[in-house]
Amino acid sequence: MLCNRLHKAAFAARLRPRLPATVASCRQVHNSDGTISEKRIRNIGILAHIDAGKTTTTERMLYYSGRTDMLGEVKLGNTVTDFLQQERERGITICSAAVSFNWKEYRINLLDTPGHIDFTMEVEQSLGAVDGTVIILDGSAGVEAQTVTVWGQADRHRLPRLVFVNKMDKESADFDACLEDLEKKLSTVPVPLQMPIKEAGKLVGVIDVLSASQIIWDSKGKGRSYKAIPISDEQLHDQVQEKLYELIDLLSGMDDNLAQAIIEANSLENVKLNLVLDALRNCTLKQQIVPVLLGSSYKNVGVQLLMDSVLNFLPAPSERNQIYDLTNSQARIEGDFINVSTFRNDFVGKVFKVTHDKQRGPITMIRAFRGTVKKGSKFITATGGSETIQRIYEPLADEYREIESFGAGNIGLCAGPKSTVTGDLLLLASKLGLQTTIPDAVYFCSIEPPSSGQQSALDNALREIQREDPSLRVRYDEVTGQTVLGGMGQLHLEIVKSRILTEYRIDADLGPLQIAYKETLDEPCRGEWRAEKEIAGSKQSVYMDMTIHPSTASESNEERIVLDNSAEAQETLKLVRPRQMTFFRKGALAALQRGPKLGGQLANCTIKLHALTIGKGTADPFIMAASAQCIGNILANARCRLLEPDMFLEIVTPSEYLPPILADLSRRRARIEDVAPRGSANKVVTVIAPLAELGDYSTVLRTISSGTASVSMEPNGHSPLNESDEAQAMRRALGLE
């Protein structure tokens, strides 16, 4: 490689004196200047596995920036971003929260997101509003199950990221093991920019690889001040030099400008530090590398350098727009990526969160991609609704400070919109279609008010919560006459019940928790349906013929309904108007939401339409109803089977408890994927197991391991049940055992 041929010592000598001997507190008075340049804005999301330290890190950022006057603590329940009563009681983040603060003449808009898998929808929506992310790892645990999940979400949104290895004050923390985890489990290229400094087993600072300096924090001043000192230990100095050479060597193979500068200089002696920093930034924005920093937020070490790295290595909104901008000339949506260039200077924004305030009503959190939002601004949603902005507030969790406007690249809280839903696209231009991906529910249960007189209030509460959280499914069961909730997990549904009680004063009753089974066909099934009726003197008539096939195709709604392309079928189908076909599709897709066995969603199936004849004057709703009736009739005579939800588990346990844990898993129909060492005393077991067998697993695991093992789990698709297990599942679901 290039670097191995050049003079290393001279370059290292140029880097060492870059930092001053003492770095004073960098706390600033917050300034809400709305005219800040887009180049000086950073929109970031904080992502992590549960309990890795997201909220604690956020609290330090707010404190050191001068946005708050005290350090909030999760265990004391006084943090800014965990403001819900349920969050403070449980010590976890449930809803994403937005905060803005200034740091070194830059504006940082930060979203603190949940780490629990039940609230993954909060993370998904937040990522559509940010330009980069900070992934936080627990230094003693490395890459955990939910880390993999949020990393994948960031990949789907094409977000550049930094990694902050937190909790490095713990005795079991291992920075090198975390780097290895990042490389092996996430298939990324981690670039460590720091090394830990410990004294008497305590983390006191970090070694900055680029400047070859030690950064030491003042433990008595809540980490507000820190100083940079030269490295006096020769062996350590050589080790840092080697890390520096490895870094430049890696970057020179990715960045042409840096490689060319090294070749032209024929020596590292004349290569400027800013070229190395530029290469780091460019490679980070292209997602070729992931810079890795370390510290301990709780012990007030390393947070200011993390904030500096957010400014130095994560993109400004204008830089992210180069990723959002697509190459074609027409406005379109590709996943969650908005072609903002099509709209010129017209306003384009996205709703990433809706909350309800008792005094102000619905509060819509909007990320502006283009244009400016002012009081009185009118816009349309991608689905065609019209909205007006009445008031605009600056984000600071659940506090509100009114401002006049906010522009491209910024985040604002808006009062006035009445019908916007989390995930909506907002435009001052032509309508676009935008479909938010909502994960399937894995549990469901009935919900009832304490009296029939409160049913209307309960329905209203559920509508408001569903606006905030589209992953909550609400439907009315015509057979039982009950309202049924679907959620991402037991905790998700418990939080919904708790919010209904604390925020709406309704002591609702949740029924027994049921598993959300899906259903599928064993073999193709064909049927026809003729519906005729006279409504208000007008004759309504529809005839249709279709086959429902088992399929492994995508679950996209467009691909679940296909037309027979034979000449005979096309003769009748070509007479169907596009609007009539739209209502046929609506009825068909609605019918596929309820299977014949347990009323579960039909999965892995495709409808092929052979014939559709619609009488003159037939109303669109009649077509939709006939479509649903035809499919219901076909499914009633079809051979179907149940699909049960599976979970991916990651269990961390001391080695001595491994045998009884594996024995217990085997009784739960679990499939052991891997058993790997973690450190010298622990094992990590990765497992796929049916959700139906995991109802009491956390409690049993604690008992088996005397409280020393931990488990995290996340959905892992569905798999078919054999006849015996299906019969047992149906008996459980019907309350027969």
Swiss-Prot record:
A Gene Ontology biological process term: ribosome disassembly
Residues that, per the record, bind GTP: 48-55, 112-116, 166-169
InterPro entries linked: EF-G-like_DII, EFG2, EFG_II, EFG_III, EFG_III/V, EFG_V, EFG_V-like, G_TR_CS
Keywords: GTP-binding, Mitochondrion, Nucleotide-binding, Protein biosynthesis, Transit peptide
PANTHER family tied to this protein: RIBOSOME-RELEASING FACTOR 2, MITOCHONDRIAL, TRANSLATION ELONGATION FACTOR G-RELATED
Family in the record: Belongs to the TRAFAC class translation factor GTPase superfamily. Classic translation factor GTPase family. EF-G/EF-2 subfamily.
Job of this protein: Mitochondrial GTPase that mediates the disassembly of ribosomes from messenger RNA at the termination of mitochondrial protein biosynthesis. Not involved in the GTP-dependent ribosomal translocation step during translation elongation.
Stated name of the protein: Ribosome-releasing factor 2, mitochondrial
Species this protein is from: Anopheles gambiae (African malaria mosquito)
Record lineage: Eukaryota, Metazoa, Ecdysozoa, Arthropoda, Hexapoda
